[in-house]
Amino acid sequence: MYILVWKKGQQIKTFHTLDEAAQFKAASNIDEAQMFSVTVAPAISASGGSNEATNLRRLMYLSKSTNPEECNPQFLAEMARVATIRNREIGVSGFLMYSSPFFFQVIEGTDEDLDFLFAKISADPRHERCIVLANGPCTGRMYGDWHMKDSHMDSITTHPAMKTILYQIARSFSSMWSYLPKSAGNMLLLGKDPAAQPPEPMSVVVTFIYLVEFGSILSNPNLTEQAAEVLSTFVDVCVKNVEGSGGNIAKFITGICMAYWPINRTEEALTAIQQISEDLAQLRSQQAPGSAVSLMYSQAGVHYGRAMLCNAGSRKSDFTLLGDCINTTSRIATLAKKLKTPLLFSFEVRCLLGDEMREEIEGAGMHQVKGRDKPVVVYQFPGPELDVEMVRQKIEQFTPGRFRCQMPVVEYEALPISQRPPIFDDTPKGNPRPRTPGYGGRQRSDSLVDRLIMIAKLAGPSVSATGDTTLTTLTYISQATRPMSRLDLSAIMRTATRRNAQQSITGTLLHVNGLFVQTLEGPKDAVVNLYLRIRQDPRHTDVTTVHMAPLQERVYPSEWTLTSATEEMLATFPPLQDVLSQLAKSFTSLETYVPSTVVRYLTAGNNPRNLMPVSCGVVMLATDICSFTSLTEKSSLTEVWMICNTFIDACTSAICQEGGEVIKLIGDCVTAYFPGNNADSAVAAAQELFTFCRQLREAFVDVLDVRGCVSCGVGLDYGQVVMAQCGSLGLTEYVVAGAVSARVMEVEAITREVGYAIVVTEPVADRLSPQLRDHGIVPTPQAIEGLPCYGIAGEEFELDVDSIKRGIKALHAARSGEKPLTEPEEAKPDFRVSPGRVRHGDSGRRSNSAQGKRSIQVR
């Protein structure tokens, strides 16, 4: 192994070969560095269960039995007997527990021993979906005397609470794992909380892979039914080739795949992207007449640079890459469309290639791209052109005939209410949300609390007499805010027993190592109201619903008004505490990364795989930070993360508060949707967000801080979208896609040109309340695809981009000690309305805030 040390020992990186170290040094322009050759030997191996081992690792995993009927105590005993013989020989200790239909296992040993054993365990046909809950170093063995201790859940305790709770948490965790970003999943595999990890700078090769003219496919009404199948095929092809070449999928964005590779995998990255094009070509040739898969082409841009792998957001999170090189990659991918090439990459990527591949490429010239002062030099592989216009014509002329796809999209409104997926947040407008001290002063919202609050409000004060009396069970987990003594637990028990008996509620409360796990059973409205009161209790935090579903009969008899199970109940099998605690912590972390629709559907007792693809009309919102490239090009990666994290938190708070659903967090860009009949709430969220940015600038006006230059534009548009889950190769995406998804980005972009921070299209304006429609919007001189656009009136919602750019230049100049350049102040443009559709009575309506500011009429 070779170690490269530079920056006077502040930066260290290891490599397997000397060539890799030298290549990294040259590509990173490192001048003063030292290289060392190191021989690494394990301190101990095959310790035979000894507690003296020093390089130990502990691994905990969850899996699902392929044949639950045969997993009785005798079956487990035989499994443990065989495992004990094997593990004693290689020095592995641990335990195995079964709670139908899930296996929970912990193994301890050296890295070499665990890697060998876990590879065999993963291939065992007696279980499937093997998911690691924790994997990290340990100072000593917890189960040194157990080479494989086994226990069936029925042998540990007859108490129904443990079996029920383990099943509910494990089921939800297992189902949500495939929706988790791989980077966040890798953190969980190491036993780390992704949200608690500091940003990690790295050098990466980044790509954006576009599904060519996917917007045209969505716009063609004859192809709407096949949109979900097209997306699912695209996801599977990208996952297979990216991960198969040593890369990582960062995210999917409506027909776009963002992926990255380490710099020593640059050639593999380009080969994988070429293979994606070849796989799609093969699929096109194999399709039956009428299949939209025959219209799938890919186009990609690749760039190399410094980026930061980090967690962004708290209420809804994204574990992704941030950095200026991400924006440049996107521009190169857009340039590929103009140059009619399927793969375009920058000069920086060319420098990382070997001599053999360099001989295959050809220059594609120097081109100016948006957001960069200097032109970029790009290269391509020789080959046939990819004419986007030709693809568009094929899509427009395409007719599916009698072809029927495997994933048909159905109209949301045509489904019975009971079968509609929970794609909207039903929280009543203006409902206060529980808050606790924490990052940003907010508590991460529980996935079901919005719907539960609505039910509670509708139920009224006398729920037990007149509300919904359907027998319902609800399980939640939470963390104690302070250590709980026996007296504290006794006080909780006394209060709960008296209160719950009056409302016919039974259940169980577990307290294990600071973790509360409670199940409530009773009339639905009574359970919901009690749960909402419990959430307000200051003695716990991070309250998260795990399961909520109707019951045929009570699991806990009526005489058990509330049963407490503490460490004493678990004394017969101490490892159960570790399993329950780790499972609950991992579930809490995972829930913030999974789409809200999936979480709501899952915790209501459904299988997410049964989510039906639907189409419906929504108000789409898109926002990003103005002049983000200029703001961040001279900022540190930590500052970039701080800007994005602050902005994303503000966006998710405003959107969720107004009943919207966050779709994607894309660097400094956030997209979301609102119900089609709730356009006013979308405008309110946009106003709240822009106000936050203004207040943020005011807070840092006297400080040389990048947050003092943060502003944003917001675009709102209305249109039909398809909502479907896509992918089957270990990664699942819940996608919200439609022509409006791309159009709303154009609406957001014109905010810089027209001088309004919030711009809406006419379809959105038609859905606003009469007061806002008649007195709160102003026509703009711009139109998007023939749709007139309007700005939200008011001096407080005007956007002066020139002032923002001057502020950014002044900030960078002041921080570098330079004198800022003085530019002659340009006259403000006189915006005039271009001829378009005029409504009867428009000429007589005028906004007070707009009068005297611009000589234009208010719609």
From Swiss-Prot:
Q: How is it regulated at the activity level?
A: Activity increased by up to 80-fold under blue light.
Keywords recorded for this protein, A-Z: ATP-binding, cAMP biosynthesis, Cell projection, Chromophore, Cilium, FAD, Flagellum, Flavoprotein, Lyase, Nucleotide-binding, Photoreceptor protein, Receptor, Repeat, Sensory transduction
In which compartments does the protein localize? Cell projection, Cilium, Flagellum
Q: Which GO terms describe its biological process?
A: cAMP biosynthetic process
EC number, UniProt record: 4.6.1.1
Q: Where is the composition biased (Basic and acidic residues)?
A: 815-831
Cite the Guanylate cyclase domain residue spans from the record.
205-333, 619-748
Molecular functions per Gene Ontology = adenylate cyclase activity; ATP binding; blue light photoreceptor activity; FAD binding; photoreceptor activity
Mark out the compositionally biased spans (Polar residues). 846-859
Short name of one Pfam family? BLUF
**InterPro entries on file:** A/G_cyclase, Acylphosphatase-like_dom_sf, Adenylyl/Guanylyl_Cyclase_3/4, BLUF_domain, Nucleotide_cyclase
Q: Which PROSITE patterns match?
A: BLUF (PS50925), GUANYLATE_CYCLASE_2 (PS50125)
Cite the CDD domains for this sequence. CHD
The record's annotation in Gene3D superfamilies points to: 3.30.70.100, Nucleotide cyclase
Q: What does this protein do?
A: Acts as a blue light photoreceptor for the step-up photophobic response. Mediates photoavoidance.
- Indicate what this protein is called per its UniProt record: Photoactivated adenylate cyclase subunit beta
Q: Report the source organism.
A: Euglena gracilis
